Structures are given as structure tokens and as C-alpha cells.
Amino acid sequence: MCIRDRKKEINGVYLGADRYLIGVNDPEEYTEQMEDSRIASLKKLVNRWDAKVMLVPTADNILTDKLPAFAPHYDEMRLLAKVKESVGEEHYIDVYSALQEHAGEPIYYRTDHHWTSLGAYYGFLAWADNMGKFPYPYNTAGMKTVSEDFQGTLQSRINVAWTKDRIQYFPETEKKPVSVTYDFADTADSLYAPEYLETKNQYGFFLNDNHAFIEIHTGYNPGKTLFVIKDSYANSMIPLLAAHYETIYVVDLRYFNGKLFQLMEQYEPEQGMDVLVLYDCIHFLEDFKFY
């Protein structure tokens, strides 16, 4: 076990203030060449599909007051400025500002690298604002708690007794029946998988964890279709988007081995579809690649 007392770091995790565990994102690991390569691919997708882009900052860039003194972290604000300049302001969803405004609220888990349902809600509002949509009126005061003993990926890495997180969701997302198909085979009638709450991977509660391809049919907005290219940050926000679309297709490029544009053309309806790229900044750099 590597422990650096000055930075309060264990195995790539900062031991932050207020019991926050924050993943270490070393600035030296994310080169300008890597940034430019990912942004070039993103611009190609945006130009072809008129896509919207939401790259979510990780906790180290928003909860800076929780970081140990002098702890280095990758500057995602600089990356986001490059992305915005490349894809154009109309395609760029500024979730950074939305999260920064609510940094004093529990928008990230303390023991996991994801944002919470509250964080995803603020992302949803930023998306609606960019799209010119009146957002479905979810009630943050009415969020339902399904677990109070979640210990996420960062907790697993430090292997030290720490704190426990609460997992919540918006019960309004269950107001209408849905039909969900995972990986062209398995079907479900919910956007949630409560069986994951009995496992170590409790975040899998959202959208039944990660899958190469998900097809969602809702009782909302006939004729409206959304295609999402994403990492796991999207799993807790997609249920909030369901009230705005009849059909949502979701692809995770980490597990999908086919040709992305060919898949999108296959599922695009005659009237067209909205396209959303939704990643956290670090996984965008590490995983955003398609053929």
C-alpha cells in the first residue's frame, strides 16, 4: 500500500475533508495529444449528428475545498474550454457551472467516483436549459432513499474503514410504465435494478449497471427519440431524461464493438433524433473512441 502523508493519499485516492474520498487524476497522465485526439473524434460526431455534449467534471475539480493542501489534480476547466471552442457553444452543455454553483450540496458520493442523483439532477437542468426545454418538475425534497450503506469504488481502493453513502432516486421516474431491453436480449419493466443494492456494486441500481446497448420505451412524448453515447455517469441521469422522450437508445463504447455511426443510422427514425454525449471528463479522455 502506497501512503503519502503529505497529500493524504492511499492507492490513488485522496483522503479529503468531511470524509470525502476523491480520486487522484494526475495531470501528467492526460497529455495534450490525448485531449486533441478525443476532441477530434467528438467534433466528427457533433458535425455528423448535431449532437449535444455534456462532459461532467469529477469531484476534484468541483470540491476543491475538500482536497488535501497542495494536492495536484488535472485541470478539467481547461479541457472543457477546448471542447467548447471545438464543438461550438450551441452544442456544449455547461454542467461545470451548474455543479460549481451547488458545490456545497451532496452532489458527489463520498466513497465513489460518480455524482449522486442530486448532482445528476443539476446536470439534467443544465441539459434542459441548453435544449430550450421546460424540465420535468422533479422534486428534490421527495427523493427516495434505497440504501444507506453504499461504499463505492474509492472505498474499495483504500481498504480502510471509512464512511457510508446514501443512494437516492426520484420516484417520479416510475410514474409511467417503461420497457427496457439490455444488449438486444434481456428485458425489464424498470429503469432500476434493486437487486444490485444487495451487492458491493450498489451503483448498478441505476440502469442495471453497464451494458453495450440499451433500448428504452416510455409513455412520454410520442415521436421523440434520444440517442445517448455515454459512460456510467449517465446511468443516474438517463431516468430523468425519460420524461422527455418516447424512445431512448443508449450505447456505452467501452462494451460496444461495432461501428457507431452504422448503429445510429440503423435506429434513427425518419423524423430524426436528438443525440447526447455524456461522460465524466476523465473517462472521456480514457475511453471515448469509436469506429
Model-assigned labels for residue ranges:
Residues M1-Y291:
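Extracellular glycan-modifying ectodomains
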